[in-house]
Amino acid sequence: MIPGSLGLGLLDRLRSWGLGAPEHIDAIFAEIRRQRGGVISYNDMVAETTRRFAAAIRGIPTSTVAEVAAEVWSGRRGALFPFVRPMVEMIRARGLRPVIVSSSPREIVRCLAAELGVGDAAGSIFGVEDGVYTGTCELMPGRPQGKMAALRRLLGVDALAGAVDLAGSMALGNALSDACVLEVVGTPIAFEPVPELRALAISRGWMISDRARLLDDLDDVLA
């Protein structure tokens, strides 16, 4: 929906505020570079960056992170891809319920959702006690099957099958962590996918789209 990572933008802003453990923040960016360079797997990168993110924000009040997230979003909201607002309206017009699931922290995912008027949104959830982050992670959608877990938690169900019309649902994703959702819906769309997801999409016969074609593609598949 927006170039880059909102979660990493949040980390950068925390550091500029003099918040967060710098050694853990630096390690997060280093692990991402290692994964992109083929040194470690995607799942190993997610596991390590999740641990590091939780450690980086340990001891920070949740209200402070929410304030920083709002500042980050204020500076990034203009970078939303032009298709995003029309896409949300198209989804609603077809009688579908828009839901956002992201691996970024829910504090900033909520900013995105509020901007789009989307009531159902999930992000990574870090442990809190007495209004302060504890250094643990309760939910990471980027983990294997993590986005399915996030959807179940968001919708308050033990299983999506039977609670959601999966065959009548559409999912859009670009990361390997999105595959667990794409493979269970009736209309999966790989949007400008990373190479691993592109290969999977080709093998499964899923639609592959990009920012220039997406609205036309949605108009076709949701007709």
Model-derived regions, located:
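Asp-based phosphoryl-transfer active-site loop
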Residues: 1-9, 182
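Amphipathic alpha-helical interaction elements
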Residues: 2, 37, 54-57, 110, ...
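A metal-dependent, Asp-based hydrolase signature
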Residues: 6-90, 97
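C-terminal cap/substrate-recognition subdomain and adjoining C-terminal extension
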Residues: 68, 74-223
